[in-house]
Design a protein with these regions (language model features):
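Short catalytic-loop micro-motif centered on adjacent basic/acidic residues
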Residues: 117-120, 188, 291-293
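Active-site/acyl-donor-binding loops of N-acyltransferases
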Residues: 5, 129-162, 240, 287-340
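A gly/proline- and charged-residue-enriched helix-loop-helix capping module
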Residues: 82-114
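Aromatic (often tryptophan-rich) hydrophobic motifs at membrane interfaces
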Residues: 58, 97-108, 206-328
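Short amphipathic alpha-helical segments
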Residues: 1, 85-87, 185
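ATP-hydrolysis module of ASCE/P-loop NTPase motor domains
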Residues: 111-127
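A conserved beta-strand-loop-helix scaffold within acyl/acetyltransferase catalytic domains
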Residues: 3-60, 64-76, 122-150, 156-268
Length: 340
């Protein structure tokens, strides 16, 4: 098996069919492995800030896998920056052989150009993380570190929506859901338009005013517009007294829903963050969705939804011993401060 490097847009476009075929055969996958996500994120968001590095594993005329990578900030990393939730190589068979080839190539390139290899959000589900652990055992200055918890709700564990509601806390039902139901707050799925986006940005800005490190959603506008029009990304909103007061943007992929971006305004005592999730879960039952994945952050409010919790890991190969020591010291200090 050999490796071919793809570093130009037109060649990236040519990969769509083979990429999709492999994705369809993968047992553990997410929307962040699709060609649509990777191409559009790179093209619309990252392409001026990074160097494209798609690796294609092939044998003769047959293509067996892809590594969706970029070189950015002196690191080799997955496409998606900090805004994707599950990282993985694109391969369905001969995975160990393919991932070993990918690692050999990126390690050689990293050594030649003094780059770090930083692969984030590798899920513990499936076998890719285990394969990568074995591969990097003999690679100097490497580490595998638990990065973040994820939360997901398997709807097949309950007989129906009513049965699921009995599993969540009575406090959540009484304080968060019932008041919103009585207030006749409207949940709807909408298609992208500029007026809708302006309301989404306003809701997000309103929420950010309560937080440290204020940000905006301007980075998300082009990718949300494109993927919504492509049918991969849905936009849901809550309306109260004719005004949009909450939004929840989610991927619909391979029988599962993946919550990606959400925010809400402060309206009286309504707990709109909870209610918009309630509405999405109710819709999921009607649409025969199998899993509602709340993705990063197994916070208490997500556990209230009777979610299953798993973990994502980061794999880093540092260009020097000193950089590894500096990073591990920083993480230990950060954890100490958080616990304190």
């Amino acid at each position: 098996m050999e490796i071919r490097v793809i570093d130009q847009e037109e060649k990236f476009c040519d990969l769509k069919e083979n990429w999709g075929t492999i994705i369809n055969n993968m047992k553990v996958k997410s929307p962040f492995q699709t060609w649509d996500w990777n191409y559009n994120w790179w093209y619309l968001v990252e392409n001026r800030e990074c160097e494209l590095l798609i690796l294609e594993a092939f044998e003769g005329k047959d293509v067996f896998g892809f590594a969706p990578l970029v070189i950015k900030n002196k690191s080799i990393e997955f496409i998606g920056d900090k805004h994707f939730d599950y990282g993985a190589f694109i391969c369905a068979e001969r995975k160990r052989e393919i991932i070993q080839l990918f690692f050999k190539h990126v390690c050689d390139l990293a050594k030649k150009r003094s780059l770090d290899i930083v692969l984030k959000c590798l899920p513990e589900k499936g076998d890719q993380l285990g394969i990568i652990r074995e591969i990097i055992e003999d690679i100097p200055h490497s580490l595998v570190r638990k990065q973040v918890d994820t939360a997901n709700l398997n709807l097949e564990e309950y007989q129906n929506f009513e049965g699921y509601l009995k599993a969540i806390s009575s406090s959540l039902r009484k304080k968060a859901i019932k008041p919103c139901l009585k207030a006749d707050i409207e949940f709807q799925i909408e298609m992208y338009n500029d007026d809708l986006w302006n309301d989404i940005a306003d809701i997000y800005d309103d929420r950010q005013s309560d937080r440290i490190g204020v940000s905006t959603l301007e980075w998300a506008r082009p990718i949300v517009k494109t993927l919504n029009q492509a049918g991969l990304l849905n936009i849901s909103t809550l309306k109260y007294e004719g005004n949009r007061v909450s939004f929840l943007i989610f991927f619909e992929f391979s029988g599962n829903d993946y919550i990606w971006l959400t925010a809400f305004k402060k309206i009286g005592k309504f707990q709109l963050g909870h209610y918009v999730r309630y509405c999405l879960i109710e819709r999921a039952y009607k649409k025969n969705v199998v899993v509602v994945d709340m993705m990063r952050g197994a916070y208490d409010y997500k556990k209230q939804w009777d979610c299953n919790v798993s973990s994502n890991y980061e794999v880093i190969v540092f260009s020097s011993w000193w950089k590894k020591m500096k990073y591990t010291s920083y993480q230990k200090g950060r954890k100490f401060i958080r616990n304190f």
